[in-house]
Amino acid sequence: MGKVLVDFQEIESYKKNNICGRPGKEGTCYYLTDDIIVKIFHIFVGNKRVYFDDIKNDFIAFPIDVYFDSMVKLETAYTMKYLAGTGLINGFPSGARIENVKQAYINLRKVIEEYQDINMYDMCLANILYDKSTNSFRLIDTSRWYPSNNAFSKNIEQFNNCLCYSLFRHNLDWISELSSVKELRELDKLHKLYENYLDNNFPNFQELLDTVSYEICKKSDKKIKN
């Protein structure tokens, strides 16, 4: 067992070229602040799917499925499950508001900006938690942190792309519904962002949240369920 890095704890030691391996083998207990997380991998090599189970914290969202998706060229967890018994809703925990998620994104981006020379190896949604109680994203369990030129842009890009992928994944039915009506499709900014995304041009996550809020909640008379 070992302590998981949370919110850039002990970052200064990494700026001194120290390297940290994973804080324990998969299936052992990890510490997240004062709570204990039991993180269990079930790896199926054939379809490259990884499952996570059992987390002891009522406020933490944690991925339940992980895909290794060639399109985004990084490990991507596309299902984030709120494990307090409320189930999955649109990739984010039940009760998380769009404005809160957007602010959490802005806040963590600012933190990443402070450490532009630190590269976060193995950043993926499997290692990005959304904490509803504090309205914040946390980065945990990175394989290595090390000084790197132009790390800031790479870190921001991966963080941004992971979250965009998760949001698109869980709203494809709404996007398809909007896109099936020609008049809406021609005016639909969300559909345009999705087309760009399919071409591997990821939108800014903040812009995407704003667009989802407007296009889905207003145009289609639907309310996003988070």
Functional labels for PLM-detected ranges:
Residues I89-K132, F137:
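Conserved kinase catalytic-core helix
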Residues F44-Y51, I89-P93, S148-N155:
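Active-site-adjacent loop/helix micro-motif of nuclease/hydrolase catalytic cores
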Residues E12-A61, D65-Y67:
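ATP-binding glycine-rich loop module of kinase domains
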Residues D34, S70-M71, D131-T134:
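Short acidic-glycine loop/turn motifs at beta-strand connectors
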